[in-house]
Swiss-Prot record:
The active site is at 93 (proton donor). This is 6,7-dimethyl-8-ribityllumazine synthase. Its EC number is 2.5.1.78. One of its GO terms (molecular function) is 6,7-dimethyl-8-ribityllumazine synthase activity. Pathway: Cofactor biosynthesis; riboflavin biosynthesis; riboflavin from 2-hydroxy-3-oxobutyl phosphate and 5-amino-6-(D-ribitylamino)uracil: step 1/2. Belongs to the DMRL synthase family. It comes from the Bacteria. Pfam families: DMRL_synthase. The lineage of its organism: Bacteria, Bacillati, Cyanobacteriota, Cyanophyceae, Acaryochloridales. It comes from Thermosynechococcus vestitus (strain NIES-2133 / IAM M-273 / BP-1). Catalyzes the formation of 6,7-dimethyl-8-ribityllumazine by condensation of 5-amino-6-(D-ribitylamino)uracil with 3,4-dihydroxy-2-butanone 4-phosphate. This is the penultimate step in the biosynthesis of riboflavin. Keywords: Riboflavin biosynthesis, Transferase.
């Protein structure tokens, strides 16, 4: 029986994509800083003018899955990290956005086979978001660590001869053999 587990070691010179929401940028820029710090400390150069990390800024969290899917479809990235903050307000808007972003990121990852890290804070208050973006800890660091581990794991997993494809049918994912 085999056991597969990723490490935080960078194999080769992997390229990462980071998709960041401008909405709630007080939070998302702090998440980005934590993410960049983690990547740097693990041997990845986060310089936007370098060759290891590409950045895509989008208007809000709702737009993140589309851009993440497009980046992943290029097969240029070992992993994509999505950074956003959805904070509950007085309307049901929070529920719709949080649910669709979650589904969209999961679908994009399954369809492309590229690890797409869910780095979307969903909090009830701005204070909770601030605590997770640097006051108490920085979740951006954790999201980058997840990306490193998943990139490494995907490199070590055996390749499938005929990998399953994901098809969408009535918003339900169905795995098929062809």
């Amino acid at each position: 029986m085999a056991v597969f587990e990723g490490t935080y070691q960078v194999l080769g010179t992997p390229r990462f994509g980071i998709v960041i929401s401008r909405f709630n940028d007080l939070i998302t820029t702090k998440l980005l800083e934590g993410c960049q710090d983690c990547l740097r400390r693990h041997g990845v150069d986060p310089n936007p003018h370098g060759s290891q990390v590409d950045y895509a800024w989008v208007p809000g969290s709702f737009e993140i899955p589309l851009v993440a899917a497009q980046l992943a479809a290029t097969r240029r990235y070992a992993a994509i990290i999505c950074l956003g903050a959805v904070i509950r307000g007085q309307t049901p808007h929070f529920d719709y956005v949080a649910a669709e972003v979650t589904k969209g990121i999961a679908t994009a990852s399954m369809q492309t086979g590229v690890p797409i890290i869910y780095g979307i804070l969903t909090t009830d208050t701005m204070q909770q978001a601030l605590e997770r973006a640097g006051i108490k800890s920085n979740k951006g660091w954790e999201y980058a660590l997840n990306a490193l581990e998943m990139a490494n794991l995907m490199q070590t997993l055996p390749s499938a001869i005929n990998p399953p494809t994901t098809k969408l049918s009535s918003s339900t994912r169905i795995l098929t053999d062809g």
